[in-house]
Curated annotation (Swiss-Prot):
GO molecular-function terms, A-Z: histidinol-phosphate transaminase activity; pyridoxal phosphate binding
Name of the gene encoding the protein in the UniProt record: hisC
Enzyme Commission no: 2.6.1.9
Similarity comment: family membership: Belongs to the class-II pyridoxal-phosphate-dependent aminotransferase family. Histidinol-phosphate aminotransferase subfamily.
Pathway: Amino-acid biosynthesis; L-histidine biosynthesis; L-histidine from 5-phospho-alpha-D-ribose 1-diphosphate: step 7/9
Keywords per UniProt: Amino-acid biosynthesis, Aminotransferase, Histidine biosynthesis, Pyridoxal phosphate, Transferase
Cofactor(s), by name: pyridoxal 5'-phosphate
GO biological process, any: L-histidine biosynthetic process
Entry protein name: Histidinol-phosphate aminotransferase
Stored PANTHER family: HISTIDINOL-PHOSPHATE AMINOTRANSFERASE (PTHR42885:SF2), HISTIDINOL-PHOSPHATE AMINOTRANSFERASE-RELATED (PTHR42885)
Length: 359
């Protein structure tokens, strides 16, 4: 048998996958901490009891109770809701449904969430970046100049990792610019912390608007992996063609439906109030800490701050078991670390450790 043309397993893989740098999630980056403030999770667990025991049967593709509860919560029709394995799957579904590999492009505005880029690269779709302006708002002219061949524009509001809302007038301008040309995906993963800013009321006006949501943040269910896509029925029907036949396991659907009950939503709002209170405490303390140069405004459950020696600070806290998120490699975020709002005890540990840093 000839071995001249034998390929290794790696050689058999697609070239773009061989070259792909995977998304560096908080868990993938690791660490041996006991204060985890790097993934924007809620700091304490919420307990649920499973009520569905029919694990011998396949689940519904789109569990009725989950869809109806979320539609009622979000103020949309059930036909405008799709549930998936986290909002990350929603990102991937949008690219798979709307972009031809090798022909179409997605566009996003760094510094922002990393999965838009990774999902496009995995699928083999061109990635276009239009860096945000100095105040991290949209460069509308830059976006307009790059719309030819762009099928999906991703905008994160509030933006991760910077924490600010995108100017609503700019979002309207973007939706007018893209009408009949591209889909605009508004990632509202953190919208529960500023619900007045949601774009759900705009879905009637803009058939090309899509909104991503999650249970990972304010609902305190990051381990559940449950997200939502809100859009007009025409878009949802296209996504239903490409989603897996059983995206949610029965236990996930069971817990999600409970979390979206009236009691579950009230509990979520209590958590938001608690988080906002702790965020203010953390902001005030950071502003009075010598190694902190600047604390940026936040509408979320995390704070971005610029430090005098951020790499040293990051490593020092890491060595003490306090795990933050280093943002130095993101465009325009030199010297910045992102800190999830934790419990009062966790927040105090961060402040105490930072105040012990040499300046």
């Amino acid at each position: 048998m000839s071995t001249e043309n034998t390929l290794s397993v790696a050689d058999l893989a697609r070239e773009n996958v061989r070259n792909l740098v995977p998304y560096q999630s908080a868990r993938r980056l690791g660490g041996n901490g006991d204060v985890w403030l790097n993934a924007n999770e809620f700091p304490t667990a919420v307990e649920f009891q499973l009520t569905q025991q029919t694990l011998n049967r396949y689940p519904e593709c789109q569990p009725k109770a989950v869809i109806e509860n979320y539609a009622q919560y979000a103020g949309v029709k059930p036909e405008q809701v799709l549930v998936s394995r986290g909002a990350d799957e929603g990102i991937e579904l949008m690219i798979r449904a709307f972009c031809e590999p090798g022909k179409d492009a997605i566009l996003y505005c760094p510094p922002t969430y990393g999965m838009y880029s990774v999902s496009a690269e995995t699928i083999g779709v061109e990635r276009r970046t239009v860096p945000a302006l100095e105040n991290w708002q949209l460069d509308l002219q830059g976006i307009s100049d790059n719309l030819d061949g762009t099928k999906v524009v991703f905008v994160c509001s509030p933006n991760n990792p910077t924490g600010q809302l995108i100017n609503p007038q700019d979002l309207r301008t973007l939706l007018e610019l893209t009408r009949g040309k591209a889909i605009v995906v508004a990632d509202e993963a953190y919208i529960e912390f500023c619900p007045q800013a949601t774009l759900t009321g705009w879905l009637v006006e803009y058939p090309h608007l899509v909104i991503l949501r999650t249970l990972s943040k304010a609902f305190a269910l990051a381990g559940l992996r449950c997200g939502f896509t809100l859009a007009n029925e025409e878009v949802i029907n296209l996504l239903l063609k490409v989603i897996a036949p059983y995206p949610l396991s029965t236990p996930v659907a069971d817990i999600a439906a409970q979390a979206l009950s009236p009691q579950g939503i009230n509990a979520m709002r209590d958590r938001v109030a608690q988080t906002v209170q702790e965020r203010q405490y953390l902001v005030n303390a950071l502003q009075q800490t010598a190694c902190v140069e600047h604390v940026f405004d936040s509408e979320t459950n995390y704070i971005l701050a610029r430090f005098t020696a951020s790499s040293n600070v990051f490593k020092s806290l890491w060595d003490q078991g306090i795990i933050l998120r280093d943002q130095n490699k993101q465009p325009s975020l030199s010297g910045c670390l992102r800190i999830t709002v934790g419990t009062r005890q966790e927040n105090q540990r961060v402040i105490d450790a930072l105040r012990a840093e040499p300046v």
